[in-house]
């Protein structure tokens, strides 16, 4: 059973429509935007002001925590005052953990109740034990007895329910039988779905949240596969939990949410950020608009889709997709050694290529990288567009000048070891204002030339890149140029270069015989532009199809992911739009195990483009270049200022490459939600912090004023600390 109609074009999943007050989710409704208040729910006036602020920036559904019965009672006053302020059509949702009594009070006042199936009727003991079938059945009966009263009351009042699983807060029962896995997340939700259905309750929305986008994506896909096989086309609420703040938080959210939206899944979204919640809505709006632009027409209305009908109508039945969408594994590829310090292949991290604006900008660009702090985020390939043969000759002159090549014998100045006078980075920093020294030897990288079709093999044969080493020659090929492909492949092999074949997946069958004859040892593939932007077409699908066609052709050549304006779902001028587009494409492919090189060519500032590429790699879990922070969005349960705390801890520990630190406002988003974090900083009581190593709490009730230093001491104790590097120019 497929989890979506197509992985190559966006076809919206058919669902029943669920009403949350006056707002419809799923069916023919648009994507709905959600967020959550951060105030203490018992501070009614402040909570109402936050609800109003969210509604005014476009939030369509507002969630409020109800951690106990007194807080749940306050939802009545909040609803009344919010309605009196003119927002009666904006529904409120109660967020419930642990206390069924709070849920029973909350359902009297709000349009929807969200329950976390991992802790609604269970207390976490993190106990390893085997459950017999009889014991498991007794646990399910206990769950039924606890959850059924809420379901019945929801039906009586016309309320809807969200069954919202979180990866890190699965019950001991689920953990011991299914593990801390996407399957465990799905089973956790389905336990509650089955109970709701026994009472005739079908006003259900489901979610599968995790801080790891790969886990989140796999869980939603598995959930849909299981639900649709059982004819349960309930709507989905999408979100990446504990994504953090700033660019990293936006990237994680866009990767997880965007990948699923392009798969056609999702009916309502929240971009969780450790920031004021009003800042979540513009990001969610931008993501939703891009996704909805791919919907050719609205799906059938709710009355045309019954729970006993198959909601999936598959298209592209002849397409071959080599990816297992439910289990991550990286595509097997041939290794290409571009330089002594840079290779692409299955044992290598995805490599970062940066576009240089023009040949005359090469020196300035390289000098800019030397001046910036880029040791952990270097440009590993330098991409230049070559529109004609004259530009190629001009590049030759520039490289010769920059490398200070002696004219007499053509020998290049040697590339020295780091710190020596011939170290390229040293030479770049010593460059004069005209950039006359240094960029000829590109530090640790290779030169990629995107050639116009008018440039011939003869033109390139006259090009002597001197100290640049092997070139990656990027050129367009299609079914009409198979003979040219053979000639170009022969030339690059004889010259020690590499050929990046820019094409579209539909061209590969016509080139297959040629590719089999050529072998993979000098080839890589890319898609720089879609054939057209037909309804539902997107570059993510094109690259997936490319991987499938290469498999059919017997090719294991690496794939270069190029984020270009021609590949965008919608070409936006703003940085947020470019970030979202690159998260959709690069993040989605990396989470499927596809991609060996990455370039973000929509960002014109090379340093910024490179940093964005590395942030994309980190967000997708494909390459780690800095510390990672798992930080929950604030809510009424939070016991300290999450925003300032996250920023403060990042400033002190952000240089710790490969260390993952969870910053959680309270226990509900604490040890369970941290998943695979190395260290945790969790609110234990007002003004008190608990520190964790993994899931284990090792220090309790520390004064918040001391907690930062104690966290650093804990990191040192476990051998993960290093001193931050000195700023450039101070060493």
Language model feature labels by segment:
Residues 1-35, 151, 155-157, 293-362, ...:
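N-terminal amphipathic alpha-helix/helix-capping segment at the start of soluble metabolic enzymes
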Residues 6-7, 12, 44, 55, ...:
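Active-site beta->alpha loop and helix N-cap motifs at the rims of alpha/beta catalytic domains
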Residues 18-34, 39-58, 62, 68-70, ...:
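N-terminal glycine-rich anion-binding loops that anchor highly charged ligand groups
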Residues 33, 95, 163, 206, ...:
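Conserved, mostly hydrophobic/aromatic
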Residues 340-372, 641-685:
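C-terminal accessory/binding modules appended to enzymatic or scaffolding proteins
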Residues 686-689, 696-721:
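Beta-strand/loop-dominated core regions that host nucleotide or nucleotide-derived cofactor-binding catalytic loops
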């Amino acid at each position: 059973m497929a989890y979506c109609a197509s992985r190559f074009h966006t076809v919206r999943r058919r669902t029943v429509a669920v009403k949350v007050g006056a707002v419809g989710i799923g069916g023919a409704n648009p994507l709905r935007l959600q967020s959550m208040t951060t105030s203490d729910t018992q501070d009614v006036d402040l909570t109402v002001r936050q609800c109003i602020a969210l509604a005014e920036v476009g939030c369509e559904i507002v969630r409020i925590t109800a951690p106990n019965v007194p807080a749940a009672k306050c939802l009545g006053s909040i609803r009344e005052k919010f309605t009196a302020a003119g927002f009666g059509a904006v529904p409120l949702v109660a967020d419930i953990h642990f206390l069924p009594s709070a849920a029973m009070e909350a359902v009297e006042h709000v349009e929807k109740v969200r329950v976390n199936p991992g802790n609604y009727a269970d207390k976490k003991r993190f106990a390893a034990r085997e459950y017999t079938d009889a014991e498991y059945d007794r646990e399910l009966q206990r769950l039924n007895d606890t959850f059924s009263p809420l379901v019945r009351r929801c039906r009586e009042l016309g309320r809807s329910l969200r069954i919202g699983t979180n990866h890190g807060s699965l019950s001991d029962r689920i953990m011991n039988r299914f593990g801390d896995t996407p399957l465990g997340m799905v089973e956790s939700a389905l336990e509650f779905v089955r109970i709701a259905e026994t009472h005739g309750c079908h006003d259900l929305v489901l979610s599968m949240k995790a801080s790891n986008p790969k886990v989140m994506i796999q869980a939603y896909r598995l959930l849909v596969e299981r639900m649709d096989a059982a004819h349960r086309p309930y709507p989905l609420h999408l979100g990446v939990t504990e994504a953090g703040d700033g660019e990293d938080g936006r990237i994680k959210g866009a990767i997880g949410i965007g990948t699923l939206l392009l798969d056609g899944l999702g009916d309502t979204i929240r971009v969780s950020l450790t920031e004021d919640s009003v800042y979540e809505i513009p990001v969610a709006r931008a993501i939703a608009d891009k996704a909805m632009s791919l919907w050719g027409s609205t799906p059938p209305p709710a009355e045309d889709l019954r729970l006993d009908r198959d909601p999936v109508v598959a298209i592209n039945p002849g397409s071959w997709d080599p990816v297992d969408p439910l289990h991550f594994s990286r595509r097997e590829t041939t290794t290409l050694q571009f330089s002594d310090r840079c290779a692409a292949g299955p044992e290598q991290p995805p490599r970062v290529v940066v576009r240089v604006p023009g040949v005359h900008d090469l020196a300035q660009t390289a000098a800019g990288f030397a001046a910036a702090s880029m040791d952990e985020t270097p440009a590993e390939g330098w991409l230049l567009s070559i529109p004609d043969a004259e530009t190629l000759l001009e590049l030759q002159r520039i490289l010769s000048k920059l490398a200070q090549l002696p004219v007499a014998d053509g020998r290049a100045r040697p590339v020295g070891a780091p710190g020596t006078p011939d170290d390229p980075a040293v030479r770049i920093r010593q460059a004069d204002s005209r950039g006359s020294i240094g960029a000829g030897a590109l530090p640790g990288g290779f030169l990629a030339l995107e050639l116009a079709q008018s440039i011939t093999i003869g033109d390139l044969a006259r090009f002597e890149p001197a100290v640049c080493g092997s070139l990656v020659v990027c050129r367009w090929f299609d079914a009409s140029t198979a003979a040219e492909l053979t000639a170009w492949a022969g030339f690059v092999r004889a010259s020690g270069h590499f050929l990046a074949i820019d094409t579209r997946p539909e061209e590969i069958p016509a080139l297959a015989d040629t590719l089999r004859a050529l072998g993979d040892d000098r080839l890589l593939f890319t898609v720089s532009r879609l054939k057209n932007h037909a309804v539902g077409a997107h570059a993510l699908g094109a690259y997936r199809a490319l991987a499938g066609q290469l498999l059919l052709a017997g090719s294991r050549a690496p794939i270069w992911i190029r984020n270009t304006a021609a590949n965008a779902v919608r070409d936006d001028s703003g940085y947020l739009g470019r970030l979202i587009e690159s998260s959709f494409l690069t993040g989605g492919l990396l989470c499927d195990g596809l991609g060996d090189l990455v370039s973000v060519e929509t960002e014109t500032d090379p340093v910024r483009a490179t940093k964005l590429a590395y942030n994309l790699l980190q967000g997708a879990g494909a390459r780690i270049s800095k510390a990672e922070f798992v930080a929950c969005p604030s809510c009424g349960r939070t016991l300290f200022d999450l925003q300032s705390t996250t920023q403060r801890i990042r400033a002190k520990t952000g240089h710790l490459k490969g260390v993952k630190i969870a910053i959680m406002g309270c226990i509900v988003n604490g040890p369970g939600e941290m998943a695979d974090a190395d260290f945790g900083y969790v609110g234990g009581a007002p003004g008190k912090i608990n520190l964790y190593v993994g899931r284990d709490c090792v220090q309790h009730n520390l004064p918040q004023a001391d907690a930062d230093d104690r966290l650093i001491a804990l990191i040192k104790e476990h051998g993960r600390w290093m001193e931050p590097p000195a700023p450039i120019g101070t060493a």
